[in-house]
């Protein structure tokens, strides 16, 4: 039966007795829940001083190393002994083959009352192993023999894996994370979870159901790897009516900042209703035009959220965020999430006052914000499929009917570069003379803006559709059929 000795994060033993006891209990419970999700039974779990001894019926080293609150986990052999000589022989007999023809070092930690020191143990074991090795090298050994002596038991370390540290999940409250699925928001979610906060995901569907399903897949991967001691929720809000409202009533350069403010407003209402302690975003200072310090101050001042807004990545640059994404195993998943078609791709204002922002928000139909905040959809990350998490729209299609009028709604430069055969650019379309008895298929890069336009055209009596997932997904599908 595999046995593991877990070194908890260094801050846990420093807490008060009451808090320390609560954190150990939560950590052991999280370990049990995570292993149970992998059909692994936790046979034994007990606190030994500042460490936790765990026994499982099958190998579980990697699973244990993915639990917040764990600093290091080591597979160990438990040795009982009566004196130093017996202990040294037990250790040597189990490690001879490991040190054979290699330079080695013996590292010993000891606690409790003994008639010997840690150095005595190291010397005795080293003397027994030296004839089988290339000698002792304390500075640059090929292999280390690591032993921890506690009372009348010794723990001989073998496989070791580093954990994430932090605090046990659920020990610090609940957070609602604004989640796009790109590089930033998953790393922000991971960082706040590392501090003991259970996170749920709030995703705004900006038009393309395909992009939103990709975001759900990132949330599931993050949950499987790091959050499996509870059941995270994926909450979606159809933001397309608000985007349409912004495009109709707000000048080009202000749209992105107004959109961010509306995201805060809806998130704050949902967080308050569902009892979250905080809202978390993946914002990094000045990474985007709408994320300058002036704009962030203006947005928060204009919205005045009841919830505290936490930004774990505020001081990170993009390269650091991407490196974290790689380290926590999400890079390949986040890199597949396409950016939604921008409502203001250029000339975004970098400095706005809260008064100006408030005046812009007042142009909008505030009833839409209330409606969107009340029409959220909640699914369990582990049990739902991407299609259940993000249902498709009736306006979306996967292929282009043969008699369709095809309209490219991207920039004119992109249209000239790689438009679909037979497509015309949006700027060339005379909607007064456009036939209403033929399918009109619109496309953009990811399917977001084209969906909004398709809805608008349907309201005017056209048989309008949006290419699901945009041009990239459509062309990828064509490649597969060739």
From Swiss-Prot:
Binding site residues for ATP: 178-179, 203-204, 260, 282, 291
GO molecular function: ATP binding; CCA tRNA nucleotidyltransferase activity; tRNA binding; tRNA-uracil-4 sulfurtransferase activity
Known pathway: Cofactor biosynthesis; thiamine diphosphate biosynthesis
Keywords: ATP-binding, Cytoplasm, Disulfide bond, Nucleotide-binding, Redox-active center, RNA-binding, Thiamine biosynthesis, Transferase, tRNA-binding
EC number: 2.8.1.4
Keyword tRNA-binding: yes
Active site per the UniProt annotation: 444 (cysteine persulfide intermediate)
Domain THUMP: 58-160
Disulfide-bonded cysteines: 341-444
PROSITE patterns in the record: RHODANESE_3, THUMP
InterPro entries in alphabetical order: Rhodanese-like_dom, Rhodanese-like_dom_sf, Rossmann-like_a/b/a_fold, ThiI_AANH, ThiI_fer, ThiI_N, THUMP_dom, THUMP_ThiI
Cellular component, GO annotation: cytosol
Reaction equation(s) it catalyzes: [ThiI sulfur-carrier protein]-S-sulfanyl-L-cysteine + a uridine in tRNA + 2 reduced [2Fe-2S]-[ferredoxin] + ATP + H(+) = [ThiI sulfur-carrier protein]-L-cysteine + a 4-thiouridine in tRNA + 2 oxidized [2Fe-2S]-[ferredoxin] + AMP + diphosphate; [ThiS sulfur-carrier protein]-C-terminal Gly-Gly-AMP + S-sulfanyl-L-cysteinyl-[cysteine desulfurase] + AH2 = [ThiS sulfur-carrier protein]-C-terminal-Gly-aminoethanethioate + L-cysteinyl-[cysteine desulfurase] + A + AMP + 2 H(+)
UniProt-listed GO biological process terms: thiamine biosynthetic process; thiamine diphosphate biosynthetic process; thiazole biosynthetic process; tRNA 4-thiouridine biosynthesis
Localisation per UniProt entry: Cytoplasm
Keyword check for DNA damage: no
Domain (Rhodanese): residue spans on this chain: 400-482
Homology family: Belongs to the ThiI family.
Xref: NCBIfam families: tRNA uracil 4-sulfurtransferase ThiI
Function: Catalyzes the ATP-dependent transfer of a sulfur to tRNA to produce 4-thiouridine in position 8 of tRNAs, which functions as a near-UV photosensor. Also catalyzes the transfer of sulfur to the sulfur carrier protein ThiS, forming ThiS-thiocarboxylate. This is a step in the synthesis of thiazole, in the thiamine biosynthesis pathway. The sulfur is donated as persulfide by IscS.
Protein name in UniProt: tRNA sulfurtransferase
Organism: Desulfurococcus amylolyticus (strain DSM 18924 / JCM 16383 / VKM B-2413 / 1221n)
GN (gene name): thiI
């Amino acid at each position: 039966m595999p046995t593991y000795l877990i070194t908890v994060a260094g801050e846990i033993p420093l807490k008060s007795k009451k808090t320390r006891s609560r954190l150990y209990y939560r950590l052991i419970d999280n370990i049990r829940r995570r292993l149970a999700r992998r059909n692994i039974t936790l046979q034994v779990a007990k606190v030994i001083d500042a460490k936790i001894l765990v026994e499982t019926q099958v190998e579980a080293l990697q699973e244990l190393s993915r639990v917040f609150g764990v600093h290091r986990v080591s597979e160990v052999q438990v040795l009982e002994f009566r004196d130093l000589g017996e202990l040294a022989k037990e250790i040597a007999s189990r490690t001879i083959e490991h040190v054979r023809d290699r330079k080695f070092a013996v590292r010993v930690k000891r606690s409790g009352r003994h008639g010997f020191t840690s150095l005595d143990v190291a010397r005795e074991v080293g003397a027994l192993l030296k004839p089988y090795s290339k000698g002792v090298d304390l500075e640059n050994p090929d292999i280390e023999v690591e032993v921890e002596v506690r009372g009348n038991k010794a723990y001989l370390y073998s496989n070791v894996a580093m954990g994430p540290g932090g605090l046990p999940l659920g020990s610090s409250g609940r957070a609602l994370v604004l989640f796009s699925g790109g590089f930033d928001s998953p790393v922000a979610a991971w960082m706040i979870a590392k501090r003991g906060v259970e996170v749920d995901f709030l995703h705004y569907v900006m038009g393309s159901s395909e992009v939103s399903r990709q975001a759900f897949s990132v949330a599931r991967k993050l949950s499987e790897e790091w959050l499996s001691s509870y059941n995270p929720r994926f909450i979606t809000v159809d933001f397309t009516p608000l985007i349409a409202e912004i495009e109709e009533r707000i000048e080009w350069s202000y749209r992105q900042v107004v959109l961010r403010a509306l995201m805060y407003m809806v998130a704050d209402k949902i967080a308050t209703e569902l009892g979250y302690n905080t809202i978390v975003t993946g914002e990094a200072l000045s990474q985007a035009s709408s994320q300058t310090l002036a704009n962030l101050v203006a947005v928060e001042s204009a919205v005045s959220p009841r919830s505290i807004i936490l930004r774990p990545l505020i001081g990170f640059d993009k390269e650091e965020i991407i490196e974290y994404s790689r380290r926590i195993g999400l890079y390949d998943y986040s890199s597949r999430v396409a950016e939604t078609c921008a409502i203001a791709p250029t000339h975004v204002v970098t400095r706005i006052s809260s008064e100006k922002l408030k005046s812009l928000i007042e142009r909008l139909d505030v009833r839409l914000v209330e409606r969107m905040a009340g029409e959220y959809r909640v699914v369990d990350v582990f049990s739902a499929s991407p299609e259940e998490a993000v249902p498709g729209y009736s306006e979306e299609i996967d292929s282009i009917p043969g008699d369709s009028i095809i309209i490219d709604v991207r920039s004119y430069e992109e249209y000239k570069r790689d438009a679909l055969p037979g497509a015309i650019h949006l700027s060339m379309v005379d909607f007064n003379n456009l036939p209403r008895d033929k399918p009109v298929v619109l496309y953009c890069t990811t399917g977001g803006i084209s969906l909004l336009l398709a809805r608008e055209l349907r309201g005017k009596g056209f048989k309008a559709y949006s290419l699901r997932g945009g041009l990239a997904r459509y062309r990828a599908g064509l490649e597969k059929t060739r």
